[in-house]
């Protein structure tokens, strides 16, 4: 394993496929990076020299990838939520944002498009108490007495 900008990259993979382990780099961008640094298609990560590794890390550090890209995406979503636009409300409700149907195939969007909530819920000591017969018995007696008075 080689660590480039804090990301573990597999030694055995070709460079163009190893670059895919970075969040924000897809196939097209990986091909573009390899072409810019003149890496051939079969060049593996373990075959890179120190000079090539430093130029690669310098090129990657100039791009918006990994944590910076995640922060930017989350800031964009929170901006949409704060201005209360249609797309922001779709994110809040966990529905598809880009106009997809909601009748059938919105299960994935309902899982992924939720805005993370940071609210915490505390339980009172009474609600954390295990339910036992001694706990339920007074309630059951009062219910039976009410039923007895009705009939």
Swiss-Prot record:
Its main location: mitochondrion. One of its GO terms (biological process) is mitochondrial translation. GO terms for cellular component: mitochondrial small ribosomal subunit; mitochondrion; small ribosomal subunit. SUPFAM superfamilies: S13-like H2TH domain (SSF46946). PROSITE patterns: RIBOSOMAL_S13_1, RIBOSOMAL_S13_2. One of its GO terms (molecular function) is structural constituent of ribosome. Gene3D superfamilies: 1.10.8.50, 30s ribosomal protein s13, domain 2. It is found in: Mitochondrion. Keywords: Mitochondrion, Ribonucleoprotein, Ribosomal protein, RNA-binding, rRNA-binding. It comes from the Eukaryota. Belongs to the universal ribosomal protein uS13 family. Component of the mitochondrial small ribosomal subunit (mt-SSU). Mature yeast 74S mitochondrial ribosomes consist of a small (37S) and a large (54S) subunit. The 37S small subunit contains a 15S ribosomal RNA (15S mt-rRNA) and at least 32 different proteins. The 54S large subunit contains a 21S rRNA (21S mt-rRNA) and at least 45 different proteins. Component of the mitochondrial ribosome (mitoribosome), a dedicated translation machinery responsible for the synthesis of mitochondrial genome-encoded proteins, including at least some of the essential transmembrane subunits of the mitochondrial respiratory chain. The mitoribosomes are attached to the mitochondrial inner membrane and translation products are cotranslationally integrated into the membrane. This is Small ribosomal subunit protein uS13m. It comes from Schizosaccharomyces pombe (strain 972 / ATCC 24843).
């Amino acid at each position: 394993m080689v660590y480039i900008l804090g990301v573990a990259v597999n030694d055995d993979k070709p460079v163009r496929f190893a670059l895919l382990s970075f969040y924000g780099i897809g196939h097209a961008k990986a091909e573009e990076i390899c072409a810019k640094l003149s890496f051939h298609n079969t060049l593996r990560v373990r075959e890179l020299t120190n000079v090539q590794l430093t130029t690669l890390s310098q090129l990657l550090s100039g791009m918006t990838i990994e944590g910076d890209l995640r922060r930017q995406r989350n800031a964009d979503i929170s901006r949409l939520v704060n201005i209360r636009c249609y797309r922001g409300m779709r994110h809040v409700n966990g529905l598809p944002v880009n106009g997809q149907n909601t009748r059938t195939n919105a299960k994935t969007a309902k899982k992924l498009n939720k805005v993370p909530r940071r609210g915490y819920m505390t339980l009172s000591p009474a609600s954390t108490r295990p339910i036992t017969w001694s706990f339920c018995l007074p309630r059951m007696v009062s219910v039976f007495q009410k039923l007895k008075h009705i009939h």
